[in-house]
Amino acid sequence: MRLSIAAALAAFALTTGTSTAAQDSFEDQVAEYVRTFPHRLTYDYTVRFTGGDPRNLNRWIGNGEPALVRAGADVVPRTNNDTYYKAAALFLEDGPVVIESSTPAVDRFNSFQLIDDRNANYRNIVFPSGKYTLYFGARPKQFEGEAIKVPSALTVVIARVEVRNKNDPDDVAAAKQLFAGLEISGAQPSQFPKLDLPAHPADVVAEAHRRMDEVFATVPFTRTVAGPGREPGRDVPYLYHAAGTKGGWGGPVPEHSAYEAMLLDGQGNVMKGSNGTYALTTEAPPVDAFWSVTVYDTERGGFLHPNEADRYHYNDTTALENANGTVTFTFKRGCGAADRNCLEVPAGRFDVVARYYLPREEIISGAWTLPRIELVAAEPPR
């Protein structure tokens, strides 16, 4: 597998190896790289997920066993840790693919998220039931369940199933039963898709990523997500879309789940574990499903931070409430047994993402947001 991934990535480099026109200005080149970045990253993840092997397309990635993402599985930045995942990269040139929820449930959040080759959502199906036929091009004369037209031949399906408490055997069993009923079937692609985009000079790429990182740190994540009625370049600026793709590829539309990313504290400063203890106190967010708070290691690319407790998030089931019904989260190095709702952070920079599943209108509109994270106990210099 390691060799096939390397070969596929080498092929990716070759297909994007033509240089940009010399007459293009620096700003034009930055703008073009930003515009095409979501295509590049979606293709890159497709290669990583499948090893560049067409036999791994149109099927669930990996062994399909339910597991929460843990530290060390560093593939997609800011992957959530509060649901089971299934994902598949589909190539529909050779025919449609059918996805199915054969054991549907409405008492536990679950969904099919469908994104195109630009990391733009074209459909989010919450509480799926039965079969859905995904097709590209002409509508098939015969199909199973609901027929869904896909805007690109290459598409990704992400399935999520809520896990309320990984330490509760009954809850885990119920989540696994629902997860096991998520199925996929379709034609075996005859070839792996190719991407043909121009290469860009290093200074252009560096400047584009600097701008993406600045946007991701300062613009609400919901404003970076593309989907129905949120077309990249028209409703969502290309730079915003690229920033959201880099910082949280595969993010769904806010009506499915709204994400609130916090890379700065309430004073506008970057958060570092070496600074001391940080805290956040909030009332329950207005959602119709569930919500969670997860911590990430910013300096390691926005991945989960390894810790002995193997805990990366709290949700509305596992978090302990204060006497007045609010919830206080603590972020620090070396969480102890007496620390309530404590998430361990690295010595360097960290960030926090709150997820609101089936958020109400006040979250979608931005009228309701979390209070800011504050440094509550400074650590003396060492």
In which residue ranges do the predicted regions lie?
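Positively charged n-region of N-terminal signal peptides that target proteins for export
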Residues: 1-4
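Bacterial N-terminal signal peptides
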Residues: 6-16
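Bacterial Sec-dependent signal peptides at the C-terminal "C-region" and cleavage site
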Residues: 14-24
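A compositional/structural signature for long, glycine/proline-rich flexible linkers
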Residues: 22-382
